[in-house]
Every structure is written in structure tokens, then in C-alpha cells.
């Protein structure tokens, strides 16, 4: 991996200007009722070049409060940025656009970084209590292509891992073509199935091609960068208290018991509880499902306070250890999934402002709850009362 480049908050070194779904990743990225042939504008979302410039501006205007660096590089050599703000003992790791057609999380992260870099008393209090680390647009190759999968061929994987020369490609390797996406000529992987709860795992031929209920392999550069950031935080702080992954889903799900379209769904369950199954027994001492549930309730409550009741619970009973959320939950992080309404191929930038603001409010529910300690007083059983998502199975 290329050496990290530190970005000066004074602008001396300029930035380069260049879940999760419970279905098999090989399936096309379309959903019933989704317009496949429309050309929808996405220019209102921040692209990779703009991201670098915006982060530089935030770092400079914060006068050192927000630190930005290049944590690593995508397969096509694009920077994967890491922004850090705060000096508290509790660590919150935020990640967006592990799927490149799911962009609202990046906008929300930028807005939060902008605020937390100010001299506001509220921002100062948060900085004193927590350390927030953000990986916005962590799959930039996919983002530039406005698609789910990254830009990586199986041949390139074998070049990096020669021990895999005789095995079949992984189950999450996209090579299909439909009206919306052409992976046949430009293959890629669902990076969110490439994680492994053993953070020191080295790919072994017998673990391929795998399936959704088995761990991933860290064969993509993007997952390797996130893993390394996570491990560095573990080494520095002892643990990563909270991990939040910001996703999108199809546009027309409803809140159970209503006709209201879901603004976004949330979840804290990605693998079976290690205390109840031998499969993950080695992680029983680190896994903290109650804390994940408390964090999710904090998100739900934050949106209710603002009058947005269209928050639902994502399908439960999942076993997805290859997701970032599954992997980091097993490693002891309280884990939260956001699944925002509509991907770029189905909605473009429609309702962008409304959806970004909702994500921000949900994230502040977590940030404030951890900073002031109120999240630890939440009854985790309240999670079970969050309405389900009608139409998801």
C-alpha cells in the first residue's frame, strides 16, 4: 500500500484534485418499480475531485480542529480520505459510499465536519468528549461510475494474491450487464462483502468462492484501507466504540402499519449473537448487541424529535460477517446501519436536501448521545419497538 500523505490544515500541502442488503450480491442493482432507463441527474452530489477540495477547505477553515489525510488509495489510484475531529476518549468511525450509488452519507459527513470545526460551544463540547473519524466516499472508483461495485478484475486480484490462481472468483464478483450497469466490460466487487472479523486474515484458497454467510477476504484495496484505519484506531484507543455505515436502499418501501414512504431504515443486527451460536463464539466477549441497539434507538429518537416519523427497522435475523458492519460488530464496536431511500439509478438527486438533513440528524443522535453519555441510559429493548420496513424480506 502506498504511504499515507498528510494534508496540512493550513493548506501547505494541497489535496489532490483529481449492508448492506440481505440478498446475494450477484443480483442486478435494480428493484421493482425502479426506472431502469431514465437518465437522472447526480451533479448535485459531491464527486471525488470536489471531495478533496471541500475537505481541504474544511481543514483550513477549522484552523487545525479538523485533520485530513489520505488513508490509502482505490484500485484505480484515487485517494481515500480520512478526516479526524475531536480529542475525546470515545471513538466514532463514520463511513460512506462503500457502494458508489449511495451518496447522501458523504454530504452529511461534510456538513458535520464543517460544523465540528467551528468555535461553537456545542462543537467544542463534542470535540472534548469524542474523537470522530470519517471515511467519506470510501469506494471512489464506484462513486465515479455511480454504481455499487468497485473497479477491479479478478485477474488483478490474482496478481496481488498468486495463491488464488486456481480458485473460482468470489461470489460477490460482478460481471453481469443490464440496462443500467455494464460490469461485463468493467467488472468489480461488492466491497461490502470483502470484510473479515479476523482483521489479520490472509486469503486462503479453501475459503473461495465463499457465500454471503461466510466472511470475506480483504482482497479489495478499499476494504484493506478501512481495515487498516480500524486497526490503527484500536491500537491508539483500545477499541472503536461506534461504527456507522451509511447506505441507500430502493425508493418505495413503507413504514409497517402505514402508507408512509421510508426516509431511511436502521439496524444494529448483522450477525447472530455469538453467545447463542458456536459459529462466532470466539467473539462472545467483545460483541455488544445491546450497545448497538442503544445507538439505533438514539438515531430513531433524534428523528422523532424533529417530526420525521418515517424511520423503520431494517430486516433482522441477518448473518453477514463479510460486511463492514458485521466484521466490526464482532470486534466490539456498537454498529449502526443507515439505509436511505433511493439509489442514484432510481432517484438521482431528488429529495437530496431532505434526505441529507435526515441523515445528519440521525448521526447527531449518535454523536450527542455518546458525547453526553445519554445513549448509555437508553433501554436497548426499545429497539424492538421500532416499526419494521414493509416490503423488505
Regions found by a protein language model. Give the residues of each.
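Active-site/substrate-binding loop(s) of hydrolase catalytic cores
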Residues: 89, 104, 117-118, 122-280
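Sec-dependent N-terminal signal peptides
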Residues: 5-16
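Soluble metallo-hydrolase cores and metallopeptidase-like ectodomains found primarily
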Residues: 43-90
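C-terminal accessory segments enriched in acidic
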Residues: 1-3, 27-47, 207-393
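Loop/turn elements at helix/coil->beta-strand transitions in domains of secreted/extracellular proteins
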Residues: 64-67, 78, 88-91, 128-133, ...
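Membrane-embedded segments
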Residues: 104-106, 110
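Sec-dependent signal peptide cleavage junction
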Residues: 17-31
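Active-site-proximal beta-strand/loop segments in catalytic clefts of secreted hydrolases
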Residues: 71-73, 85, 95-98, 135-139, ...
Amino acid at each position: 500500500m502506498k504511504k499515507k500523505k498528510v494534508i496540512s490544515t493550513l493548506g501547505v500541502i494541497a489535496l489532490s484534485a483529481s449492508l448492506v442488503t440481505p440478498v446475494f450480491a450477484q443480483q442486478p442493482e435494480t428493484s421493482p418499480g425502479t426506472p431502469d432507463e431514465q437518465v437522472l441527474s447526480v451533479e448535485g452530489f459531491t464527486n471525488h475531485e470536489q471531495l478533496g477540495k471541500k475537505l481541504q477547505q474544511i481543514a483550513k477553515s477549522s484552523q487545525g480542529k479538523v485533520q485530513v489525510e489520505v488513508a490509502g488509495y482505490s484500485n484505480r489510484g484515487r485517494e481515500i480520505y480520512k478526516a479526524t475531529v475531536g480529542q475525546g476518549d470515545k471513538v466514532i468511525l463514520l463511513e460512506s459510499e462503500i457502494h458508489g450509488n449511495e451518496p447522501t452519507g458523504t454530504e452529511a459527513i461534510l456538513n458535520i465536519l464543517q460544523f465540528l470545526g467551528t468555535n461553537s460551544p456545542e462543537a467544542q463540547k463534542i470535540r472534548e468528549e469524542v474523537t470522530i473519524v470519517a471515511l467519506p466516499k470510501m469506494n471512489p472508483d464506484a462513486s465515479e461510475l455511480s454504481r455499487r461495485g468497485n473497479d477491479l478484475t479478478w485477474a488483478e486480484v490474482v496478481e496481488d494474491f498468486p495463491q488464488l490462481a486456481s480458485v473460482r472468483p468470489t461470489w460477490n464478483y460482478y460481471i453481469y450487464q443490464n440496462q443500467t450497469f455494464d460490469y461485463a466490460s468493467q467488472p468489480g466487487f461488492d466491497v461490502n462483502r470483502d470484510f473479515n472479523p479476523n482483521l489479520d486474515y490472509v486469503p486462503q484458497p479453501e475459503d473461495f468462492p465463499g457465500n454471503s454467510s461466510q466472511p470475506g477476504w480483504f482482497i479489495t484495496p478499499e476494504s484493506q484501507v478501512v481495515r487498516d484505519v480500524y486497526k490503527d484506531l484500536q491500537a491508539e484507543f483500545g477499541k472503536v466504540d461506534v461504527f456507522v455505515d451509511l447506505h441507500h436502499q430502493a425508493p418505495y418501501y413503507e413504514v409497517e402499519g402505514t402508507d408512509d414512504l421510508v426516509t431511511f431504515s436502521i439496524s444494529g443486527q448483522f450477525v447472530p449473537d455469538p453467545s447463542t451460536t458456536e459459529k462466532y463464539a470466539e467473539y462472545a466477549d467483545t460483541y455488544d448487541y445491546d450497545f448497538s441497539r442503544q445507538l439505533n434507538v438514539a438515531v430513531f429518537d433524534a428523528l422523532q424529535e424533529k417530526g420525521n416519523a418515517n424511520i423503520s427497522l431494517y430486516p433482522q435475523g441477518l448473518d453477514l460477517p463479510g460486511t463492514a458492519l458485521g466484521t466490526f460488530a464482532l470486534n466490539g464496536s456498537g454498529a449502526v446501519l443507515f439505509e436511505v431511500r433511493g439509489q442514484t439509478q432510481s432517484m438521482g438527486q431528488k429529495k437530496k436536501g431532505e434526505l441529507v438533513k435526515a441523515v445528519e440528524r440521525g448521526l447527531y443522535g449518535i454523536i450527542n448521545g455518546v458525547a453526553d453519555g445519554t445513549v448509555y441510559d437508553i433501554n436497548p429493548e426499545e429497539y424492538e419497538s421500532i416499526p419494521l420496513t414493509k416490503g423488505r424480506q
